[in-house]
């Protein structure tokens, strides 16, 4: 009970440190009176917790954030506020930034005095924010080791997300990587009796920014073994072009011409490489302010931008939309209170890029048909491009030239008050073996609009008409050879294979939110063909809502093709269930297709485990007199995932096992982990076995000190390790690392660790007053090795096998403990116990030899990422 007020005081201190946002020149707003503490903590020095930033002066590795967005992670010098010219008598330490750090934080250095900027750059000295930027503020979060800075927008370059330069991209290390997925199935009875094993392999080798990749499949079944290499490629980046270069098996995007595969080369711009501010189209907001006004921009009721503008015309293009589509409502409030409101149209389904931006792609090689490797492979070249000619207006086009085939495309997309639209035309010329040349055209129109009043979203994804002489490249090649096997440069007739070519396409989707009553959507598709009376049509109507905790979905569809017309009605209900150690959901459905019996099903699926690593489920499905029962479960661990399923019906049973995993071979050995198909982070944390990766399902550090984690390319990735499961003698000097990887790279994430000797310093009865809360413990050299917590004890790290520890009491006297860990007793968690015995205060200094009594482990204050010793250089 004596420790309760002490815990409360610590909580208040940390709450002030985490929540306060005092400027460096702000006086202490609160005072913690040590007289309110009970027991030996009475009289402890708590003055430094009177401030939101309770750090002592020194160098600390911290994560710097601006407006809750991560900027950089660097070692920052903290100086006493009174030495920074603030004139405080008692004050916290404040951050002091160098020229390089200010530049990395993307502040507007041109707004400062040029002489001051030149001095910072040449001298290498640092300066506090309060001297550089008026009204700037800072606060430090002990628990997160996070320095939050607030700088007025006038002094910042990017108001929302920090743009990333190609110079910051990390190409990664030399490594071999392998991802695998397997499936084993045993069918008993029914039409598919037998066993089958399939294995998918995704392998690669990375070397100095070049990435070799191969995807292959292996299969065993019905007494046969099959192996197939699906794709092999070698790729790298061209940073100055913001483009990627690929050799080998490549695929066309399908954005301009119908997609196809080829073996050759492809080079083209990649939007993921662009700065954040250029990746997403957004219309420029233009207006005129009569006075110094406040501008607010709303999208779907969400505030996406707010800033003050001077009198005169203004143009705003550095905001982040809440969604890709939906008109923007602009509210301009003048200094005299007058308000003007206007709307800027913004729609999304039609692709648009920013004014002045150009995106392009070029490919050349031989056509590849995975279904017929023996087919003749014509050479093909494709060039496409898109350019933003004005705000909301794009021109795009392309050329495709191949043996016996040529095509050209030109189009325009634009944003209007009535919605976003795009229109293009494609002309083709095909040399067919029987009928000679076939010339044709294909017209396409797209439209999208979100109605602001009702929030109705309209997507006319495709309205296309193709003439009888129009062929796309893949259709012409796949028509098959006729007599000459295509060696005369002509293609066979498509109709000879009994296949029709598309004539017209129409598709539309509407969605309508109904507030608290759910949402409604309608979609329709119609397709006609040349050379046939075939018509494919599909209509779907859906409604979803929430009734209490029950989710309700109703779907009605009609599908019509040449063979049949089918109607289907389906009702789904889902009920979430929550328990102390697990969670799950019960789903039930009723479905009726045509005149078939009503199909009923009830399923339960759940998750359990500390990190939801276990999933399980069971279900029953009934239609008429037949029933099917299913049972499944899965496990996700550090080294992969495994799942199994058992299905049993009236005349058949099926057993199925699926799994996946991956590995990376590098200079430090071979590290196993979960399946990774993209960019990989290789965690290196020596002696930190068991440390888990925060915000991942089950990634962790293995016994060799390595781990694997998935990363997002060309973006700032923050990977955090949890020290919760580490032994007390191992300390992570850094729990968070940041990296900006290239696509496909294996990037090293080095977490420095300290494997120090740790011990427990415990005050003997009668000496508790020497080891009160917050008291620093130093070794014989004067280095801080620990801070006292509760229970008149302190966890000390980095101590030698024998020596002296000392603490300074409130009256200035020093109490020492001489120890030898070889003869010390064992405390909780196997740590050696060092006893501290002191004379009453005022009685001078007194040393104490080590004793072997065990004590309970106390709590202690620690600062993540840096030793407690102030390091002012």
Swiss-Prot record:
GO terms for biological process: pilus assembly. Pfam families: PapC_C, PapC_N, Usher. The keyword Cytoplasm does not apply. Its main location: membrane. GO terms for cellular component: cell outer membrane. Keywords: Cell outer membrane, Disulfide bond, Fimbrium biogenesis, Membrane, Signal, Transmembrane, Transmembrane beta strand, Transport. GO terms for molecular function: fimbrial usher porin activity. Transmembrane segments: none annotated. It comes from the Bacteria. Belongs to the fimbrial export usher family. This is Outer membrane usher protein FimC. It comes from Bordetella pertussis (strain Tohama I / ATCC BAA-589 / NCTC 13251).
């Amino acid at each position: 009970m004596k420790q309760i007020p002490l815990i409360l005081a610590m909580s208040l201190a940390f709450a002030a440190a985490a929540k306060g946002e005092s400027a460096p020149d702000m006086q202490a707003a609160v005072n913690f009176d040590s007289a309110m503490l009970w027991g030996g903590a009475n009289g402890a020095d708590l003055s430094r917790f009177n401030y939101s930033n309770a750090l002592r002066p020194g160098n600390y590795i911290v994560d710097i954030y601006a407006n809750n967005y991560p900027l950089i992670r660097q070692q920052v010098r903290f100086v006493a506020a009174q030495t920074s010219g603030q004139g405080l008598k008692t004050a916290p330490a404040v951050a002091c930034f160098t020229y390089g750090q200010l530049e990395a934080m993307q502040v507007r250095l041109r707004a400062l005095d040029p002489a001051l900027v030149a001095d910072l750059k040449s001298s290498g000295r640092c300066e506090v924010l309060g001297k550089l930027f008026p009204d700037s503020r800072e606060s430090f979060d002990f628990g997160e080791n996070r320095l939050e800075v607030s700088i007025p927008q006038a002094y910042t370059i990017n108001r929302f997300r920090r743009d990333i330069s190609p110079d910051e991209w990390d190409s990664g290390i030399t490594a071999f990587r392998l991802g695998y997925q397997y499936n084993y199935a045993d069918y008993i009875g029914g039409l598919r009796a037998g066993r089958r094993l399939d294995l998918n392999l995704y392998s690669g080798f990375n070397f100095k920014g070049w990435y070799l990749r191969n995807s292959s499949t292996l299969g065993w079944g019905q007494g046969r073994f099959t192996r197939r290499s699906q794709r092999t490629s070698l790729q790298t980046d061209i940073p100055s072009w913001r483009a990627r270069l690929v050799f080998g098996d490549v695929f066309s995007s399908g954005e301009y011409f119908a997609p196809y595969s080829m073996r050759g080369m492809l080079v083209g711009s990649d939007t993921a490489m662009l700065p954040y501010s250029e990746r997403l189209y957004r219309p420029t907001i233009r207006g005129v302010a009569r006075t110094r006004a406040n501008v607010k921009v709303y999208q779907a009721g969400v505030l996406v931008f707010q800033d003050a503008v001077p009198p005169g015309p203004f143009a705003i293009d550095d905001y982040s939309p809440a969604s890709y589509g939906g008109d923007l409502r602009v509210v301009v409030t003048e200094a005299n209170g007058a308000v003007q409101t206007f709307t800027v149209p913004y729609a999304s389904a039609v692709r648009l890029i920013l004014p002045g931006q150009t995106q392009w792609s070029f490919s050349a090689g031989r056509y590849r048909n995975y279904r017929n490797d023996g087919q003749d492979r014509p050479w093909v070249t494709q060039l496409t491009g898109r350019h933003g000619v004005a705000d909301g207006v794009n021109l795009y086009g392309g050329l495709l030239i191949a043996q016996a085939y040529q095509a050209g495309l030109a189009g325009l997309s634009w944003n209007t008050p009535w919605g976003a639209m795009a229109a293009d035309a494609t002309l083709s010329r095909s040399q067919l073996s029987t009928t000679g040349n076939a010339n044709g055209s294909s017209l396409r129109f797209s439209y999208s609009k979100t109605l602001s009043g009702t929030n109705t979203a309209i997507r006319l994804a495709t309205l296309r008409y193709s003439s009888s002489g129009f062929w796309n490249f893949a259709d012409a090649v796949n028509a098959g050879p006729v007599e000459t096997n295509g060696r005369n440069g002509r293609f066979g007739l498509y109709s000879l294979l009994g296949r029709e070519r598309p004539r017209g396409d129409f598709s539309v989707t509407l969605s309508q939110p109904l507030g608290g009553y759910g949402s409604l959507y309608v979609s329709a598709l119609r397709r006609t063909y040349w050379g046939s009376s075939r018509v494919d049509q599909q209509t779907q109507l859906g409604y979803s809502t929430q009734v209490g905790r029950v989710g309700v979905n109703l779907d009605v569809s009609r599908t019509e093709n040449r063979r049949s017309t089918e109607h289907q009605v389906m009702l789904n209900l889902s009920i979430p269930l929550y328990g102390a150690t697990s969670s799950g959901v019960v789903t039930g459905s009723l479905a009726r297709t045509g005149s078939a019996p009503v199909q009923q099903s009830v399923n339960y699926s759940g998750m359990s485990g500390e990190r939801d690593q276990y999933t399980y489920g069971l279900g029953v499905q009934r239609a008429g007199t037949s029933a099917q029962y299913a049972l499944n479960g899965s496990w996700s661990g550090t080294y992969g995932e495994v799942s199994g399923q058992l299905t049993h019906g009236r005349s058949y049973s099926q057993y199925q096992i699926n799994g996946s995993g991956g590995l990376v071979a590098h200079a430090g050995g071979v590290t196993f982990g979960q399946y990774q198909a993209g960019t990989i982070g290789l965690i290196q944390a020596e002696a930190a076995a068991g440390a888990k990766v925060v915000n991942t399902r089950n990634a962790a550090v293995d016994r060799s000190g390595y781990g694997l984690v998935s990363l997002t390319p060309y973006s700032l990735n923050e990977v955090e390790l949890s020290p919760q499961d580490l032994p007390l003698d191992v300390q992570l000097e850094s729990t968070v690392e940041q990296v900006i990887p290239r696509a496909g790279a294996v990037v090293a994430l080095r977490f420095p660790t300290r494997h120090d000797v740790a011990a427990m310093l415990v005050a003997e009865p009668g000496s508790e007053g020497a080891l009160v809360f917050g008291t620093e413990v130093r070794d014989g050299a004067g280095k801080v090795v620990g801070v006292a917590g509760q229970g008149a004890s302190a966890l000390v790290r980095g101590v030698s096998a024998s020596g002296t520890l000392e603490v300074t009491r409130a009256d200035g006297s020093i109490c020492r403990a001489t120890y030898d860990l070889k003869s010390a007793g064992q405390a909780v968690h196997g740590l050696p116990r060092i006893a501290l015995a002191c004379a009453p205060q005022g009685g001078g200094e007194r040393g104490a030899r080590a004793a072997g009594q065990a004590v309970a482990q106390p709590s202690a204050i620690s600062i993540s990422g840096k030793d407690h010793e102030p390091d002012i250089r």
